[in-house]
Amino acid sequence: MKRLRHILQSKHLIKIITIIIFIITLLYTNYYPFKSKYTKNDKEFIGIVTKYEVKEDKITIEIKAKEKLLITYKYQDKEFNNLSYGDKIKVKGTLITPSKNTNQNTFNYQKYLYYKKIYYLVEATSINKIANNHNYLYTIKNILYQKIDKLKSSNYIKTLLFCDNTLSKEIKESYRINGISHLFSVSGMHINFFVSIIYLYLNKITYNKRIKYLITNIFIIIYLILFPSSSLLRSAVMSILYSINYLLKLKIKKIDILLLTLGVSLLINPFIIYDLGYIYSYTITFFLVLSSSTLKKKNKINKIIYISLLSFLVSIPITIYNSFEINIISILLNIILVPIISIIILPLTILTYIFPILDSILYLFTNTLETISLFISKINITKIIFPKPSLLIVVLQSIDTFN
């Protein structure tokens, strides 16, 4: 153990390993020929339901077949209320190649799906369930979802607890414009909150820290498997590495743990390097870790202001690169909303899940938040439009922000 500790405490080892993994990831994701296992002539597909969303006259389903497929099906007289995660279905339809962006600097839907390893869309003509779910993890997921399906605030419970952002496009776009969309991603704040609750109960059972860390890490891993997301992966890996570092007394620096987090995340999912949610989450966390000594000297109010300001500043280059605009009111919104969401809305979301009678209160908060966000997003005077910068400029701007 002493030898391992000595190796990991090496000044440059972790940095070199992370850089090597990063370079290999770039080469692998850009030059390895990823191809679909299907051909355009295929008309029938059998797979397991991993995601689905039912609207008035359309259902969108993601299935795990020979590869991931995204299915859309318009129906008139058939309902899909009996569909569950883990069900095996047979789909008949036509394979469609996802559309590319028509303008160079606009959203590329084909590339977005490619990074999720989805190469084809399916326009379904029929969908039939051929077997019910028998997977224990999917059963847990179904039970968790069934409890909230009829609640008015179910979309926010799914978003804040289950990494399933089912908010309307209009609302999501207003949050993006106002620079607060990251507040609705399951991240370190959520993990810390859940771990604190688990610790609160475990303190009544045992004082053994190893057992506490083991149980919380098992919870985090199951949580990640049930509700996979890019920002959650970063938070989960980092939390587990922190606990290993503490238990084994490896004395690895925080910044090196963060670099290890990137390396492990890329080994788990190489394409996460292109995920905007992960880029935001990791970049903001990276600069917060670098600023940890400064944060320790500040009181709670100043800490919230500092975190909000730093998060906004370091995310500016990323936002400009992807959206070509920033909203200067984002600073104020983050300062106001970070404590509201972390102290009021997130705990209330958990309580509403446990006690559905609180649904109307949570709905009042979230509906008010949506109304304010929609109003502010339409104020053009606070928006600044930029030409798309090069990637090098984005990196240099981020470094300069911290300096």
Where are these regions (language model features)?
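Divalent metal-coordination and catalytic microenvironments
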Residues: 47, 93, 160, 187, ...
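Alpha-helical transmembrane segments of multi-pass integral membrane proteins
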Residues: 287-390
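Membrane-interface helix/helix-cap signal primarily in integral membrane proteins
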Residues: 2-7, 19-182
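Alpha-helix C-terminal capping segments
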Residues: 37-40, 62-65, 144-151, 201-205, ...
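Hydrophobic alpha-helical transmembrane segments in multi-pass membrane proteins
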Residues: 5-12, 16-20, 122, 172-330, ...
